[in-house]
Amino acid sequence: MDCKLRAKNCGGCPMLATEYAAQLKKKEADVHALLGKYGPVAPIRGMETPYHYRNKVISTFAPAAGGKLTSGIYAARTHKVLPVESCLLQDEVLDKVMLAVRAAANACRYQPFHEDKGTGLLRHCLLRRGVATGQVMVVLVTAQPVLPGAKNFVKALLAEAEKRGVPVTTVVQNYNPRRTSVVLGEDEKVLYGKGFILDTLCGKTYALSPRSFYQVNPVQTAVLYGLAVDAAHLTGKEVVLDAYCGIGTIGLTASDKARQVVGVEVNRDAVRDAIGNAKHNGVKNARFFAADATAWIREAADAGQKADVVFMDPPREGSTPAFLESVARMAPKRVVYVSCNPETMARDLALLTQKGYRAEGFTPVDMFPHSAHCEVVGSLVRVK
């Protein structure tokens, strides 16, 4: 497919000009080059329709002609905003919602924030959609603590969304006064609805707040988590550790097949969401702790605690030697490694295989079509 933004230095889809089959072939070959020496690499799991998969959109506001504002994304390696009407990666409903936000903001005569001058009101708009439920969240990020005429904005937004045939479930104002590239600030105010939306994934329902970490490609996330839980070979008797657990998605997916799930996550907001998600789904065999994964597992190993299976889904920088050594001391029968960076996964596997684990195999999952990124599920078994 052709994209008008690509000619304007968007940079969001570096592989868009490459046939999708060729993209998959390259990603599979890259994973094999990095991980093949540890175990077999299965064929990559691609998407049937590799477009409009992103259920989360972040747009930046910018000045437009006639004293109005527009919204879009930064051009590659710049702070120049490219106006976006539609995007081949973004959920098509969210494209329309963003146009409704823009129209409502212009109707209220809001001005975009100017980075250099520090003037203006609107910085960003974050949109989320629960693809299974159809619910939509609008988060308006402002440079000032008060949104003038907030009720009028909500009324205008709902009317503009209705014109375009799209829903708006909740509207949240987020106040971010800092000079930073971080999108969200600390303070929030619910302007409409409950301040969260629901989505269903792998048979569980999740409440998503503005800050919730949630995979942006729901189709491939279901594939990824299904592969991870299958790789654990759970029988219902196992104690499972879900490290770097986020809002608990992998652990809760596995909870029906495990005796007990223990989740560990450093982000306290995510842990609060995980506890709420367990309660909402009636899961009584899962506990979640707010702690650094390395510090927590080291302490658990020192205390002689054991786990039958460890799920680990670390950030792009991978895990730490201390974490991996503590895993080996806990001696789980299986380790299921979910990686968003095969390079750091290969580094971590070098240590795990020295500590008595053997890789049974790896399955690449194309979570982000038209980008260079690839996720991998790896299964390791204890051999000594």
Language-model segments: residues:
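Short, aliphatic-rich beta-strand segments
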Residues: L127, G134-A143, T205-S209, V309
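Rossmann-like S-adenosyl-L-methionine
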Residues: P148-K384
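N-terminal, Lys/Arg- and Ser/Thr-rich interaction peptides
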Residues: M1-C10
